[in-house]
Amino acid sequence: MDLILLQKVTNLGNLGDKVSVKPGYGRNFLVPQGKAVPATAANVEAFETKRAEYEAKANSILAEAQSRATKFEGASVTIGAHASTEGKLYGSVGPRDIAEAFTAAGLPLEKSEVILGEGAFRNVGEYDVVLHLHADVETTVKVIVESDA
C-alpha cells in the first residue's frame, strides 16, 4: 500500500515522503491517526498544494514538543509503593504510574510517551526514564521509587 506521510513517522519517513507499507499498518494505524493519506493522483496533487500548511503544522508540533522537553529537564518524581524489607515491590511501577505521577506534579504526560527499556520497575530505587515526546524529541527524567510501608 502506497501512502504519503503527513508528518514524520519514526522508522518510516518524513513529511511528504511516499512510502510503501503493509496494508494493515496503513489502513488501521497511519490513515486513521492522520499521519498519512493514500498516494492517489488526487491526494498527491492536494498534498503539493497544501505542503506549506503541513510543514507549518509539523514545525509547530515540533516546537511544542521541544518546549515540553525543557519543562521536563531536571524533573524528578517520587512514587510510593508497597515493598518488602529487602526492597522488592509487591507489584510494579509502569508507564501509567509514571505518567500519572508527573501529571499530578503539574507536568502533563501520556503513558505512551514513557519509554521503559527493561520493563516495569520491580525494586525500590532511582531510575532514569526516557520520555519520547516527538519523533525528534526525547528527554530523560528521574523516577524515585520508595517504599511507603
Swiss-Prot record:
Lineage top rank: taxon: Bacteria
One BP term from GO: translation
PROSITE patterns reported for this sequence: RIBOSOMAL_L9
UniProt entry keywords in alphabetical sequence: Ribonucleoprotein, Ribosomal protein, RNA-binding, rRNA-binding
GO molecular-function term, one example from the UniProt record: rRNA binding
Recorded GO CC terms: ribonucleoprotein complex; ribosome
PANTHER family in the record: 50S RIBOSOMAL PROTEIN L9
Protein's job: Binds to the 23S rRNA.
Family: Belongs to the bacterial ribosomal protein bL9 family.
Record's protein name: Large ribosomal subunit protein bL9
Provenance organism: Xanthomonas euvesicatoria pv. vesicatoria (strain 85-10) (Xanthomonas campestris pv. vesicatoria)
